[in-house]
Amino acid sequence: MKALSKLKAEKGIWLVDAPKPEMGHNDLLIKIKKTAICGTDMHIYNWDEWSQKTIPVPMVVGHEYVGEVVDIGQEVRGFNIGDRVSGEGHITCGHCRNCRAGRTHLCRNTSGVGVNREGSFAEYLVIPAFNAFKIPDDISDDLASIFDPFGNAVHTALSFDLVGEDVLITGAGPIGIMAAAVCRHVGARHVVITDVNEYRLELARKMGATRAVNVAQENLKDVMKELGMTEGFDVGLEMSGVPSAFRAMLDTMNHGGKIAMLGIPGGEMAIDWSKVIFKGLVIKGIYGREMFETWYKMASLIQSGLDISPIITHHYKIDDFQKGFDAMGSGQSGKVILSWD
């Protein structure tokens, strides 16, 4: 089968002929229709320090996808040949305390599709049936292929009550932009998103952000005054991993504010902890998606009218995968879809 593999311990990714994956009694074999390129895939492509420590070489990568079930393990129930599915990319152990308590997104033994095991940048993928999610008929393949990052946005945004609240999102990557759309859809008052990438800020405006602020050109506190905000942000969603952005968030949060953090800093990050203490802030770390509450909410949000389609800006056939990675690397894109049909 065709597959994109991290074939060498250097920058790049390679289109190869790989063996079709073998499945077990509890697995599904999925014929991939579309995949999307994630920021994690770009880390792997660029072979940065994290990738060098984490990714086995060679390995098929990728974890954002939609496909069709073409074979079913003999112990599997609830799925049929022809079902259209995406899937949870975090494979959990099932036996740790959190798994047994139903908090599988907090499994201490999580293995990542396309990170620790063979991924979805291939014509076929095998995953445990437990991890598969049936896609409703009224949700397109394009949208289904980005359910993984959309789930990060939904999990982060819905961590706290948003109705009538003022929300600050730091980092206008695709996940931050989708989070802005979610916040507006569920009833937030002002949704302000910050970045320095004007292309992505314009995407955020199209997706419903009240204000998309280029912090290299505008002062966040001036924007708050223009919006008539007299206190501070009630909810903060940190999506950038940039220390200066997080410090700006701490400066502008209201007392008693709540922060959900998805962005991963490049190293240790110093902050003024007295602001956290004296403001009584709550900080929650976010990793992945809640299984499978987030997945059901994703489908319901789209079915209730949330439009995240503008975040998809580029489509390529798999043979043109290099153009897709170049588009992602340029910073002048939203989500990039690769078609395997």
Swiss-Prot record:
SUPFAM superfamilies per UniProt: GroES-like, NAD(P)-binding Rossmann-fold domains
Highest taxon of the lineage: Bacteria
Cofactor mode of binding and number, as noted: Binds 2 Zn(2+) ions per subunit.
Record's keyword terms, sorted: Cytoplasm, Metal-binding, NAD, Oxidoreductase, Zinc
Enzyme Commission number(s): 1.1.1.103
GO molecular function, one term: zinc ion binding
An example Gene Ontology biological process: L-threonine catabolic process to glycine
Catalytic activity entry: L-threonine + NAD(+) = (2S)-2-amino-3-oxobutanoate + NADH + H(+)
Known pathway: Amino-acid degradation; L-threonine degradation via oxydo-reductase pathway; glycine from L-threonine: step 1/2
Active-site feature positions: 40 (charge relay system), 43 (charge relay system)
Subcellular location: Cytoplasm
Residues annotated as transmembrane: none
GO cellular component: cytoplasm
Pfam families (UniProt xref): ADH_N, ADH_zinc_N
Gene3D superfamilies noted in UniProt: Medium-chain alcohol dehydrogenases, catalytic domain (3.90.180.10), NAD(P)-binding Rossmann-like Domain (3.40.50.720)
Keyword NAD set for record: yes
UniProt function note: Catalyzes the NAD(+)-dependent oxidation of L-threonine to 2-amino-3-ketobutyrate.
The protein's assembly and partners: Homotetramer.
Protein known as: L-threonine 3-dehydrogenase
Gene name as annotated: tdh
